[in-house]
Amino acid sequence: MNMPRSLWLLVIGMMINVTGSSFLWPLNTIYIHEHLDKSLTVAGIVLMLNAAASVIGNLVGGVLFDKIGGFKSILLGIVITLVAVITLVFFHGWPVYIYLLILIGLGSGIVFPATYALAGTVWPEGGRKAFNAIYVAQNVGVAAGASLGGLVASISFHYIFIANAGLYAVFFLIAYFGYRNIDAKRASQTSILDQKPAVKNSQKFTALVILCIGYLLCWVGYVQWPSTISSHTQSLNIPLNQYSLLWTVNGALIVCAQPILSQFVKYVAKTLKQQMIIGFFLFIVSFVVASYAEQFTGFLLAMVILTIGEMLVWPAVPTIADDLAPKGRQGFYQGFVNSTATGGRMIGPLLGGMIADYYNMNLLFIIIISLLIFGIFTTLIYDKRLKATIELGTVPNQ
């Protein structure tokens, strides 16, 4: 891919950033529940606070990008995160762990929107390819970080914190020396906070809201994997390194299966709605398989099915939002989509933790499957009230 050097720097930085965070995030629930001896409900609350801090970070990052540019915004986010992860090396007991996770959420939240905004400005002629490159880099980081994290955690969780801090230090150096001369062209960028949502009576916005209800429910289900399901695998005596391998498979499949996916959406699921319906169905099948799984192979099969569903749903929603957005409101619509995803990440661990704590995993699986079925319904009807038929294309090759 003939990308400019500045975009390659952003891609490499994002990959290292996500690799560092992926050392820790799939294991957060296990660490809080097994090592800090807290309930799954408490673990869910902690993850919810981390996600809430990320929401604030995203909004702050958007404002900062407009005010001071991408370089300073990213650097500030990295510094906040780096201070937190270095402190985590020395202090990772209760309740300090909560405060540091909140700081990590805030810092990383600032980094992501600024990175995406920079990617669009350094290679405007690349169109979606610039964002796809960042997306693939994230998944390479997830695969590498989750795999290595499980191996390191099986030796000692303390080494997880050290590795995390080391990778963020490398990310800081790349950003400090590599991003300084990247022209952010910030005058052409807008922040979600500057977008006035004067869309109350818009049929298109109503369609987006209905669509995002299903998207939120999908995320509520998805985040059970790094929260309640991770703890569930421990109760079944599945080793940590095997659980972490599930996320390696997830990231590797997303990266390697893009050519197959592009052919599938070209010849089978030709519209975005079809892709989402099939994706939701695969999510349901994945949770059915996981509900019966007692060995690693069962969870591996469930993860493969889940990942294929994710590859269909995740790119489709922002693409539909872009198609629905009136001119000049693209930022607001995309911000709404991102907020919905974060909302699912906030609600999911807490809801799942409470159900697993007070009832059992079987009931949790039933509830998640029911929510996903409702998500199919909202996806089917989201555009019914639009005055004109909106022609939806397929997800671009990634």
What spans do the regions from the language model cover?
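C-terminal ends and interior cores of transmembrane alpha-helices
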Residues: V79-H92, F281-E294
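Juxtamembrane intracellular "pre-TM" segments in multi-pass secondary transporters
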Residues: M1-P4, R180-C212, Q398
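Helix-loop boundary and gating motifs at the non-cytosolic
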Residues: M3-A51, A207-W247
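Residue-level signature of mid-helix packing/kink "hotspots" within the transmembrane helices
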Residues: A51-L59, V142-A143, G251-P259, R345-M346
